[in-house]
């Protein structure tokens, strides 16, 4: 097991903690990570795009000119796709882009992402992430103290409205509960800032 430092919210080292190799020490599987990120983005799509085919556009019932003798190409409708205001060929219609992945695949991708972060030294463990009041300035100071400036994912063991509201106005900073972390958010962040209790939850849920 690898050992990393545990900091307090002031950035001072207060101890160490061992990371479970079954979660933070595997060889990352990039193909699986790619598939899970693709699945996440597909599931986020609204799927509301819609356009009209030539049969659905209003008008165009009359033949614009006679078949022969005009010098024009033959035309049967002003709503054919090559015309301005004509219908769309294979027009998109509202549909769901979501699809299901095997749970084992998702779990492997999550472990791969966490292992990659651990190998890169981009996991920061804090003994307790707690704030008395909603204060964005204080939360930004905390991130600076633990050297997690920039894109960061702050993970707490349970939902903490004070932390969520303190962090939500800082560009690039996201928050999550330990049991709800996903591969996309982990990879999008430069640093993974874990409450020590959140680390215990992750190891309990995903080991």
What kind of feature is each model-predicted range?
Residues 31-68:
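A short, flexible low-complexity segment enriched in Lys/Arg and Gly/Pro that occurs
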Residues 4, 8, 18, 40, ...:
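Exposed boundary/loop context
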Residues 54-90:
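Glycine/serine-rich anion-binding loops at beta->alpha junctions
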Residues 1-46, 91-207:
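Extended polybasic, low-complexity segments that bind anionic RNA or targeting/receptor surfaces
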């Amino acid at each position: 097991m690898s050992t990393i430092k545990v900091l307090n919210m002031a950035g001072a080292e207060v101890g160490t903690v061992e990371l479970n190799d079954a979660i933070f020490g595997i060889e990352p599987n990039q193909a699986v990570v790619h598939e899970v990120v693709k699945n996440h983005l597909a599931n986020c799509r609204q799927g509301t795009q819609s356009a009209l085919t030539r049969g659905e556009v209003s008008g165009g019932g009359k033949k614009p000119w006679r078949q022969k003798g005009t010098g024009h190409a033959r035309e049967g409708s002003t709503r054919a796709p090559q015309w301005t205001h004509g219908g769309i060929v294979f027009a998109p219609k509202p549909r769901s882009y979501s699809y299901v992945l095997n749970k084992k695949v998702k779990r492997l991708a999550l472990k791969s992402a966490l292992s990659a972060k651990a190998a890169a030294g981009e996991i920061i463990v804090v003994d307790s992430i707690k704030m008395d009041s909603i204060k964005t300035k204080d939360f930004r100071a905390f991130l600076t103290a633990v050297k997690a400036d920039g894109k960061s994912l702050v993970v707490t063991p349970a939902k903490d409205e004070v932390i969520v509201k303190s962090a939500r106005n800082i560009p690039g900073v996201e928050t999550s509960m330990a049991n709800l972390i996903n591969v996309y958010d982990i990879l999008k962040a430069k640093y993974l800032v874990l409450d020590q209790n959140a680390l215990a939850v992750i190891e309990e849920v995903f080991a």
